[in-house]
Amino acid sequence: MAEITASMVKELREKTDAPMMECKKALTEAAGDLAKAEEILRVKLGSKASKAASRVTAEGIVATWQSADGKLAALVEVNCETDFVAKNDDFLAFSAAVAELVATRNPADVAAIGALDLGGQTVEQVRTALVGKIGENITIRRFTRIDAQGAVASYIHAGAKIGVLVDLVGGSEALGKDLAMHIAAAKPKALMASEIPAELIDTERRIAIEKAREAGKPEAMLDRIADGTVQKFLKEVTLLGQPFVKDDKLTIEALLKSRNASVASFVLYIVGEGIEKKVSDFAAEVAAQAAAAAQK
């Protein structure tokens, strides 16, 4: 059998970006044939990616990209399994690259991103290799692309766990940044009341009526009480109705009016929002890992 040297391992690692021990194993299996070892690694990395695909990816980051003139921007959420990997440099670089591709290439949906070119490979090939290198499932969950009416302001908060884009027409760069930070803090569901789904308003109304009834309020007053409750709810969940976080005596609508500005649209992403996280049994995980190691 050919001797597997450190320089051979280094060369294969540089070509494939695979972990060092995986490179050594592949070279051993290939009897020192570098090309064959590379093929073996491609198969193994693909296999790892397939095995990881069923695992929950509730951690991750949001990443943004925007043009210098603020006219084009994108916000993406890329998920992984643990917060540790969410801080990995390769994972961060991949997420940033995906955000730029979304903005500049305008894919139709998440599936279409996988076919885009990224450094001579498809995004899906790069993702698969990254899964093999890191050992965790990685998924591109969602994206929003804004072709701005005005100029886009962005804000990333809390270790890239919350991301905001705001298309601000008029105003200033400072106002855009303030609005983006406000959205991250206040988390509005919509820009204005007309964008809130009717079924959500109906639910709030029914709850208000039942609460008032249980409190012993007269039946003749229930509708009026419900109206007031719904109006309060709409102010709480719409950007224009919310009090400005830096001055709660001023609503966002009033703030915009005072600056002769308007918001064309905004998007808010919170990492893992709506994903049910798997509750781990640490002892069971250790036992499973020990059993798997014993079988090798």
Curated annotation (Swiss-Prot):
GO molecular function terms listed in the Swiss-Prot or TrEMBL record: translation elongation factor activity
Domain of life: Bacteria
A UniProt-annotated Pfam family: EF_TS
Subcellular location: Cytoplasm
Protein keywords: Cytoplasm, Elongation factor, Protein biosynthesis
Main location: cytoplasm
Function per UniProt: Associates with the EF-Tu.GDP complex and induces the exchange of GDP to GTP. It remains bound to the aminoacyl-tRNA.EF-Tu.GTP complex up to the GTP hydrolysis stage on the ribosome.
PANTHER family documented for this protein: ELONGATION FACTOR TS, ELONGATION FACTOR TS, MITOCHONDRIAL
HAMAP family assigned to the protein according to its UniProt record, in alphabetical order: EF_Ts
Family: Belongs to the EF-Ts family.
Protein name: Elongation factor Ts
